Amino acid sequence: MKDWLDEIHWNADGLVPAIAQDHRTGRILMMAWMNRESLALTVRENRAIYWSRSRGKLWRKGEESGHVQKVHELRLDCDADVIILQVEQLGGIACHTGRESCFYRVFEDGAWKVVDPILKDPDAIYRAGHPHE
């Protein structure tokens, strides 16, 4: 029997893009990367755990902010190279900028326009030194 992790087409760095989507509304919240370990832990712990390329380590979403993503369903695309996580976003904030979604800008009239409000000041979410904006 084939291991379910072996069915995924990992990129040259051993990563796969993972899109977090609100399980109720369908809104795309964010995109991050997963490796085999983070995906296996996500399934085991039923919460989103990503691979931070900038920090070179596992990133348990919400470990600093408290904005944990509880996983309701995982989906693999037809090419087996993108994962969607249907999540419940605790605290209603997925983005390190303090917004609901990382996709808060719309292309309009030749420019990117911010259309979503900041729900909570990032300085109030993260301790000093966190690289937000």
Curated annotation (Swiss-Prot):
PANTHER family assigned to the protein according to its UniProt record, in alphabetical order: HISTIDINE BIOSYNTHESIS BIFUNCTIONAL PROTEIN, HISTIDINE BIOSYNTHESIS BIFUNCTIONAL PROTEIN HIS7
Q: Which organism is it from?
A: Azotobacter vinelandii (strain DJ / ATCC BAA-1303)
Pathway(s) served: Amino-acid biosynthesis; L-histidine biosynthesis; L-histidine from 5-phospho-alpha-D-ribose 1-diphosphate: step 3/9
For binding Mg(2+), which residues are annotated in this chain's numbering?
D77, D79, D81
GO cellular component term, pick one: cytoplasm
* Cofactor requirements of the protein: Mg(2+); Zn(2+)
Gene assigned in the entry: hisI
Name the chain's protein: Phosphoribosyl-AMP cyclohydrolase
Which Pfam families does this entry report, sorted A to Z? PRA-CH
This entry's Gene Ontology molecular function terms read: magnesium ion binding; phosphoribosyl-AMP cyclohydrolase activity; zinc ion binding
Q: Does the keyword Magnesium apply?
A: yes
E.C. number, please? Answer: 3.5.4.19
**Cofactor binding notes:** Binds 1 Mg(2+) ion per subunit. Binds 1 zinc ion per subunit.
State how it assembles.
Answer: Homodimer.
